[in-house]
Every structure is written in structure tokens, then in C-alpha cells.
Amino acid sequence: MHISIVGITGYTGLELLRLALNHPHVTVSSIHATKEVGVQISDIFPHLKGIFDKEIQVFDSEFIMTHSDLVFFATPSGVAKDLSKNFVKNNFPVIDLSGDHRLSPDVYLKWYKKSPCTVDIQKRFTYGLSEVMNISHRNRFIANPGCYATATELALYPLISNHLIRVDSIIVDAKSGLTGAGKKLNQSSHYVNVNNNYVTYKLNKHQHIPEIVQTLQFFNKSLQNIQFSTSLIPVNRGIVATIYTRLENGVKINQIESTYKDVYKNKPFIRIKDGLPQLNEVIGTNYTDIGFVYNETTGVLTISSVIDNLIKGAAGQAIQNMNLMFNFDETDGLILAPLYI
């Protein structure tokens, strides 16, 4: 099949390209951006020289629909909702890696502070949490989940949906590598501000909060909100979500382990660890590693969920959704050993 990538020069766009080039069933037909149009991508990113040398093209939906079978949007929030309209009109498959189609329009406006897509368009998009939402060939439009949301939702979904934890007790402390802040120059991600430092940002205001709540409420209506904090750590890639919660009355700790293993037993990219996971065990992969510890003294269950924010938190999950949409094996192009060192 042939694909097009819009937003090729960002971190996520580049990672999407890297994964697509190693996919057994995919040819990258065109790449698009607002800048460097007409320039070979390998002239901007020399690591691609001799591997992929196509020119960056101006965005043209008609050209994409003529030459490709699917379009990926790896664009900043506020872009895809406008550029995707013609694809939706023509029922042409779209996977949007931005937040533009994840939330209802009123919630999007509140949290993103940008004009939303229409209700009709948003309802046509399926939220692409691959292990949970049963993505298939019936789905034409996918709203790829956010990175923090992916790590948090996959850790909580089995427990929330089976009513094993108190939904009024959830605290999430999530930490991200610097690529999660995007490529745009910003004072908060300046080298001297993040090197040898730990920076908490968007406390109680991160746009993934309503996404997480919306998704988990679908499986347990009792959940009203979560306490969620986000911090930057001085690594390039990765997310560590540390979650604190309490068990429902009568629930035993062995039920937590058995539920995780039962829910995810046929999910190739979820690994339930015997101990707590480490970030370097997932970097460069599409895996989500989940582990937990229960404190008998305080009655607190601590869950740790780790992912590579650029792969499972973005490009890898997008490829996984593409595989499910087009009836490929779910793991095609995604069997990657962790970089580890």
C-alpha cells in the first residue's frame, strides 16, 4: 500500500517515516510540510541520505488521494482539523497523530484554546488506543492517542473496567523526555533549562487530562476526574507514568495481577512485568511495559507504565492502527528490539 505523511519535518513525522520505510507492505509515496518545499528530505536530515531522498511537497489533498491509500497527519494541534476535511468528505482513510479529533469540540476548545472541528467530523473519528478499541477495516478515520494518555490509559484500563480500584483515588505523576515537548523552540525546553534539571509544567492544565478522563469514563462511568501532573526529564525519549490508587473494598492484590495478564494476554505490545519496568527497556520499541507494587501498610497500589513517546506514544501506535485498518498483521513493521543502551 502507499501512504503520505503530512508534517514530515517534526520528530513524530520523522519517526513515522523511519517505521514506514521498514514496513513490509508500505511504500511512502509523498511527504509534505509547510517549509522546505522542494527540498530533498535527506538534505535537511542527512541521516536519510541514500535511504530516502524524496522531495518535500506542498500539501495537496487531491494529489494525496490520487497517489496514496492512506494519509498520516503528524502536525501540531490546530492543523489537521482543517487539512483533513477533504479526506473525510471523500471517505479517504486518515490517521491523525495530533489532538484535533480526540475530544468533543467543546472540550477541545476549552483545553487546546483553538477552534475545533465540527461535531459531525469528530464523531467519524475512532479513538485509536490499539489494544482497547478493536480497530479494524471498518474504521476509516483514526484519532491517534496522545503519549501521556497512552501510557496512563493502558495502565488503568484493565483495573477501571473491572472495577478493581477506587476511581476517586487516582493520582498520576507522568514524566516525559524532551521530544515530547515538540521541535518548536521554547524557553522551557532550552538545553540549559532542562539539562541536569527536573521541570514540572502544565500542572492541572495538560491537554491529555480530558482525553484520559473521556476514555476511562467510557469503561467506568463513576470516574469523574484524575489528579495528573507532567514533568520534563533530561532524556530524549520516553514516558514514565507512575500511578497511585487504592483498591476497591474486598479486592485482593492477586486479582490485580491476574486481571492485567488476562486482559492483555493476546496483546503483543503489552508486557506485564514481575517487577517495576525501566525506561531503557522500551526505548526504540512499540512496547508498553507495566508493573505494580502494593503497600500493605498504606493500602496504596503503585503502578508504573513506560513507553517510548515517539513510537508507542505516537508513530508506532499509528502504524499499529494502520495494520489493523488494512488487515495486516498487527506487528508488521513493529518488531523492534529496545535500544537499551
Curated annotation (Swiss-Prot):
General function of this protein: Catalyzes the NADPH-dependent reduction of N-acetyl-5-glutamyl phosphate to yield N-acetyl-L-glutamate 5-semialdehyde.
GO cellular component: cytoplasm
Location of the protein in the cell: Cytoplasm
The family this protein is said to belong to: Belongs to the NAGSA dehydrogenase family. Type 1 subfamily.
Catalytic activity from the UniProt record: N-acetyl-L-glutamate 5-semialdehyde + phosphate + NADP(+) = N-acetyl-L-glutamyl 5-phosphate + NADPH + H(+)
InterPro entries in the record: AGPR_AS (IPR023013), AGPR_type-1 (IPR000706), NAD(P)-bd_dom_sf (IPR036291), NAGSA_dehydrogenase (IPR050085), Semialdehyde_DH_NAD-bd (IPR000534)
Catalytic residue list: 147
NCBIfam families to which the protein is assigned, alphabetical: argC (TIGR01850)
Biological process terms in GO annotation: L-arginine biosynthetic process
Domain of life according to the entry: Bacteria
Single annotated GO MF: NADP+ binding
Keyword set, alphabetical order: Amino-acid biosynthesis, Arginine biosynthesis, Cytoplasm, NADP, Oxidoreductase
Residue spans crossing the bilayer: none
EC number, as in UniProt: 1.2.1.38
The name this protein goes by in its record: N-acetyl-gamma-glutamyl-phosphate reductase
Pathway: Amino-acid biosynthesis; L-arginine biosynthesis; N(2)-acetyl-L-ornithine from L-glutamate: step 3/4
